[in-house]
Amino acid sequence: MQKFDIKGTKTEKNLQEAFAGESMARNKYTYYASKAKKEGYEQIAAQFLETANNEKEHAKIWFKLLHDSDIPDTATNLLDAAEGENYEWTDMYDRMAKEAREEGFDRIAYLFEAVGKIEKEHEERYRKLLANVEGGLGCSKDGDMIWQCANCGHIHVGKQAPGMCPVCEHPQAYFQLLAQNY
């Protein structure tokens, strides 16, 4: 994709608006699909989901143009995500809860506060993952751990995930710690 110098232009603002609009439409259509499915309209649900996927791809076009035609590396994305979550719980939801409470909407204020606490957990998760990526610890831990290939389900026990899955040959990055607390 061609690169453009759009910083500070109306086109940059339009790309941001297009990205936001397509992103919101995608979520809305997935909610509509769930409702249609609950009401027994399988074909309509499928159409909503197909359109939601189209909207996701449209949003990706605008996102890439906003980021010099490329999605940044994982460390950059983790930092961006952590900072976004930080803003949500320290500023956005705190402010929104206060305003809702001032207007007499105590239940909505509670929900803003409760979601804000979840966003704090999200920030902490992203910062831990970033530290793992920066420290090369994503696929290596102290002591034996149970690793599972996210692609085929192969289980490996060791301090480090294998460099490549011996079953499906996916790279080490596909291994994750096996979740066993159901």
Give names to the regions the model predicted.
Residues 1-182:
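Non-heme di-metal
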